[in-house]
Amino acid sequence: AIGPVADLHI
């Protein structure tokens, strides 16, 4: 995504 930790929960 765009945020700093927006993709860690995948």
UniProtKB/Swiss-Prot annotation:
Q: Which GO terms describe its molecular function?
A: hydroquinone:oxygen oxidoreductase activity; metal ion binding
The UniProt entry's GO biological process terms, in alphabetical order, are: lignin catabolic process
Q: Which GO terms describe its cellular component?
A: extracellular region
Protein name according to UniProt: Laccase-2
> What is known about this protein's pH dependence?
Optimum pH is 5.3.
Q: Where in the cell is it found?
A: Secreted
- Cofactor(s) recorded in Swiss-Prot or TrEMBL: Cu cation
Catalysed reactions, as listed in the record? 4 hydroquinone + O2 = 4 benzosemiquinone + 2 H2O
What family classification does the UniProt entry report for this protein? Answer: Belongs to the multicopper oxidase family.
Q: What else is known?
A: On the 2D-gel the determined pI of this protein is: 4.56, its MW is: 62.03 kDa.
Q: What does this protein do?
A: Lignin degradation and detoxification of lignin-derived products.
Give temperature effects on activity: Optimum temperature is 60 degrees Celsius.
Q: How is it modified after translation?
A: Glycosylated; contains 8.47% carbohydrates.
What does the note accompanying the cofactor annotation read?
Binds 4 Cu cations per monomer.
Q: Which UniProt keywords apply?
A: Copper, Glycoprotein, Lignin degradation, Metal-binding, Oxidoreductase, Secreted
Q: Which residues form the signal peptide?
A: none
Q: Which domain of life is it from?
A: Eukaryota
Broad enzyme group? oxidoreductase
The EC designation for this entry is 1.10.3.2
